[in-house]
């Protein structure tokens, strides 16, 4: 039997104390990416991390790569389009072969929600879920929390804040992970989407973006995940944007909290998810999320590999 090993497959794998530890460490790195201690660099310099991404990625894979390098570790990034999976090798066999090379950690992304949990059964090194189907994306939720933590100043200040998720909530692993994490921290949540993009949930829901904007201290826009839809829901993305785009006019007219902040996990469909002018607004935290992604993933890698 494989030895017990600490993985990060979903946010519930972490206690609240561990989340606080990660926030504190990541905040240090967000202030200065070079604030890695000599001791950490020395311990990380012989670590080899493998990234197995079976779905496309820009921010997540680059963020993990940069985080690894900033800590002093080495990272091997496989191109799955040219790997033996294209020759019919199964996911499990691919993983077992990479695992046999004894990396110090493996980061994986897959279209199946169950994939990381199945792989964890075979893993004797830390396994990090970088996105699985529609179910989980724990490091994205953690970096989003870091963004809120740094904006509002503390977890205590976050309690009671209202966040509205706008867009394809049903198919969003980002929303799923964020909702589970933020509920633990006492935030009030609303979901805003057309019926076909809403999950069955006890949470507050609305089909009206104006209602969501009026409700929220925090707006998180979500991409329409057309690759996960069985049939078109709107005639075009433009039609969807007419109903659900976060625009300056909607913010000016309906936001009760004029300091409402806007987040998006990316990739952003400009003028469909969020109006270009809003993306350039000081209330947009989208690029801060990207920066915080490197910092949080540095903290996660250090936590799993060294602590």
Curated annotation (Swiss-Prot):
Q: Which SUPFAM superfamilies match?
A: Aspartate/ornithine carbamoyltransferase
Reactions listed under catalytic activity:
carbamoyl phosphate + L-aspartate = N-carbamoyl-L-aspartate + phosphate + H(+)
GO terms for cellular component = cytosol
What's an example of a GO molecular-function annotation for this chain?
Answer: amino acid binding
From which domain of life does this come? Bacteria
What InterPro entries would the database entry show? Asp/Orn_carbamoyltranf_P-bd, Asp/Orn_carbamoylTrfase, Asp/Orn_carbamoylTrfase_sf, Asp_carbamoyltransf, Asp_carbamoyltransf_Asp/Orn-bd
Record-listed carbamoyl phosphate binding positions: 59-60, 109, 137, 140, 266-267
EC number(s) stated in the UniProt entry for this protein = 2.1.3.2
Keywords tagged on the record: Pyrimidine biosynthesis, Transferase
Where, by residue number, does L-aspartate bind? 87, 173, 223
Gene Ontology BP, a term:
amino acid metabolic process
The pathway it acts in is:
Pyrimidine metabolism; UMP biosynthesis via de novo pathway; (S)-dihydroorotate from bicarbonate: step 2/3
What HAMAP family does the annotation carry?
Asp_carb_tr
Show the PANTHER family listed in the entry.
ASPARTATE CARBAMOYLTRANSFERASE, ORNITHINE CARBAMOYLTRANSFERASE, MITOCHONDRIAL
Q: NCBIfam families of this UniProt entry?
A: asp_carb_tr, PRK00856.1
Assembly information from the UniProt record: Heterododecamer (2C3:3R2) of six catalytic PyrB chains organized as two trimers (C3), and six regulatory PyrI chains organized as three dimers (R2).
Cited function: Catalyzes the condensation of carbamoyl phosphate and aspartate to form carbamoyl aspartate and inorganic phosphate, the committed step in the de novo pyrimidine nucleotide biosynthesis pathway.
Please report which protein family the annotation says this sequence is part of.
Answer: Belongs to the aspartate/ornithine carbamoyltransferase superfamily. ATCase family.
Q: What is this protein called?
A: Aspartate carbamoyltransferase catalytic subunit
| Species of origin | Helicobacter pylori (strain J99 / ATCC 700824)
């Amino acid at each position: 039997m494989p030895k017990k090993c600490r993985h990060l497959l979903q946010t519930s794998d972490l206690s609240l104390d561990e989340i606080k530890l990660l926030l504190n460490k990541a905040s240090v790195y967000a202030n200065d990416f070079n604030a890695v201690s000599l001791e950490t660099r020395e311990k990380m310099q012989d670590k080899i991390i493998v990234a197995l991404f079976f779905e496309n990625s820009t921010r997540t894979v680059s963020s993990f790569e940069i985080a690894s390098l900033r800590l002093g570790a080495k990272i091997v990034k496989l191109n799955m389009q040219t790997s033996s999976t294209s020759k019919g090798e199964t996911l499990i066999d691919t993983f077992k072969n990479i695992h046999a090379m004894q990396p110090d950690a493996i980061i994986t992304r897959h279209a199946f929600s169950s994939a990381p949990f199945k792989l964890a059964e075979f893993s004797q090194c830390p396994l990090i879920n970088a996105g699985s189907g529609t179910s989980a994306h724990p490091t994205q939720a953690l970096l989003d929390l870091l963004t809120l933590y740094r904006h509002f100043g503390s977890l205590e200040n976050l309690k009671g804040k209202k966040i509205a998720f706008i867009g394809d909530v049903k198919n969003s692993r980002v929303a799923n992970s964020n909702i589970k994490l933020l509920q633990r921290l006492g935030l009030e949540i609303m979901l805003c989407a057309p019926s076909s993009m809403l999950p069955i949930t006890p949470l507050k829901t609305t089909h009206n973006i104006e209602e969501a904007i009026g409700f929220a201290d925090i707006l998180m826009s979500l991409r329409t995940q057309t690759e996960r839809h069985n049939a078109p829901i709107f005639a075009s993305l433009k039609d969807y944007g007419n109903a659900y785009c976060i625009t300056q006019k909607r913010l000016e007219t309906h936001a009760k909290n004029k300091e409402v902040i806007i987040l998006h996990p990316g990739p952003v469909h400009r003028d469909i998810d969020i109006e270009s002018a809003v993306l350039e607004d000081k209330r947009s935290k989208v690029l801060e999320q990207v920066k915080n992604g490197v910092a949080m993933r540095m903290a996660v890698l250090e936590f799993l590999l060294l602590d």
